[in-house]
Amino acid sequence: MSEARPRHIPVLGPEAVTLLAPRDGGIYLDGTFGAGGYSRLILEAAATRVIAIDRDRSAIAGGFDLVQGAGGRLTLVEDRFSNLAEVCAAQGAPAVDGVVMDIGVSSMQVDQADRGFSFRQDGPLDMRMGTDGPTAADVVARASETDLANIIYIFGEEKFSRHVARAVIAARKEAPITTTKALADIVASVVRAKPGQIHPATRTFQALRIFVNEELDELYQALAAAERVLKPGGRLAVVTFHSLEDRIVKTFLAERSRVGGGSRHLPELAQAAPSFTVLTKRPTTAGDAEVAANPRARSAKLRGGERTAAPAHRPDDLPGWPTLAGVMKAGVTRAGR
């Protein structure tokens, strides 16, 4: 396979593909195409077919050379990975042998100042992975102080969330907050960081990005969809980069692999048959060499499971993942919904 696009090595890419164990003739779903690193590794590992999804139109356009070099074995689809079951069916592959997902914003998106993901370079306060729905600037402009504080606390795990929200509300009364630098400066004025710690705006930017893109709900829906499309013996590999994502994946696999049953007195408490076997009792993390080459890998965790022959569970059978059911966007509707 040959292509002109620079080679991209994804975080924990070799480990994720080893976990998937691609085989000749197998069909694999890359739920987060990005720069194409996982898709490329799967295509190189065996004579496979890969269906790759990304909601970012620029990522799909950037994959043209890889598609050309794959000899008809790679199909790119612009969509959300929560719709992966529908995508697979539309591509004539209602059941697949493996699913890989790399959760969160890509390095490619962070490096583009005009996408508004990074506080390290100035750009419009956008943060959308696609082209639909409200931007981060919309949320910052319209959310109430309470809603904004809850967003930052729940999705950013920022202990100074109320201070940040108060500062944002005060600042927007003076002038609209429309750039990443403007927001980062506001956050830095109330959140102090010691030398060697993360940038003061890190958690606030994470929270807004997750909220704007509905990332946690998307992740859970994608996991449930993967459960439906994986063949018995098919494998799921998920790379996460922060505790909220990892908690969802860990809980999903734990719930889906749990063995239990009701008693003759309370048969209604019987546990559904396990739909997964956990392959990673502890998450796989990046080694020193990978972290040195790519600092983003420091927080990465890889978890995986193998599909059993049991029916898929109901998609609402995962308690306790973080949501904002009680938080309305004060005039800002959820992206694309």
UniProtKB/Swiss-Prot annotation:
Primary localization: cytoplasm
Subcellular location: Cytoplasm
A Pfam short name: Methyltransf_5
Enzyme Commission number(s): 2.1.1.199
Molecular function GO labels: rRNA (cytosine-N4-)-methyltransferase activity
Keyword set, alphabetical order: Cytoplasm, Methyltransferase, rRNA processing, S-adenosyl-L-methionine, Transferase
Binding residue positions for S-adenosyl-L-methionine: 36-38, 54, 81, 102, 109
Region (Disordered): 295-323
GO CC field: cytoplasm
Biological process (GO), any one: rRNA base methylation
Catalytic activity entry: cytidine(1402) in 16S rRNA + S-adenosyl-L-methionine = N(4)-methylcytidine(1402) in 16S rRNA + S-adenosyl-L-homocysteine + H(+)
Coiled-coil parts of chain: none
Top-rank lineage group of the source organism: Bacteria
UniProt function note: Specifically methylates the N4 position of cytidine in position 1402 (C1402) of 16S rRNA.
HAMAP family hit by this protein: 16SrRNA_methyltr_H
Family: Belongs to the methyltransferase superfamily. RsmH family.
PANTHER family: 12S RRNA N4-METHYLCYTIDINE METHYLTRANSFERASE, S-ADENOSYL-METHYLTRANSFERASE MRAW
Name under which the protein is recorded: Ribosomal RNA small subunit methyltransferase H
Originating organism: Rhodopseudomonas palustris (strain HaA2)
Gene symbol of the encoding locus: rsmH
